[in-house]
Amino acid sequence: MPISDKTKKRFAYNSSSISNNTDNSFIEESTKIVYGEEETTKTILHALNNSQERWDNYANSKGPTIAMGLEPLRKGIKNAYSRGIKIRYISEITPNNINYCKELMKMAEVRHLDNSKGGMAVSETEYIATAHLQEAKPVQQLIYSNAKEIVEQQQLVFESLWNNAIPAEKRIKEIEEGYDRI
């Protein structure tokens, strides 16, 4: 049974606090759940556009189809790339998403990790995550946070995953040569 918008709003968790950022101005820290394709897409693009140095992504095999298959997200990534943002992307590269991964590799450093689940992205100041990704379809709900401790924790999680992933070029070569991973 679908959850009504009224129920979603009533149960959505939103916690806020004030934090001092690096330029001595104060920002409101927030952690919340965002629902609906339009709102989640806006939130993803907001975080991507706010990135100043880095945009690190981790996603299951559907992630590249969303990043490159949905026009607003593809444009957002392309814009970040043109602004000089360092983009890194971890996904499970498969025969079904290999072309999306190749397209993504034009703008990002891409790595492969077997059995990837869900998805997340983290910049220097913001974090977003979702548990469910569908091929070339907008995200239905996600968690957003700009809380410093959460962002720092997720940066460490991403670095650990990145260090365990293999270069996309290696995985693509395996697929194209018919090598089957066990």
Task: Give short role names for the model-derived ranges.
Residues 1-30, 41, 63-182:
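PLD/PLD-like phosphodiesterase catalytic module centered on the HKD motif
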Residues 45-54, 182:
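Secondary-structure "cap/kink" motif recognition
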Residues 31-35:
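Short amphipathic
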Residues 53-59, 87-89:
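A short, Trp-centered hydrophobic/proline-enriched beta-strand micro-motif
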Residues 36-43:
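A short, well-structured juxtamembrane/interface segment
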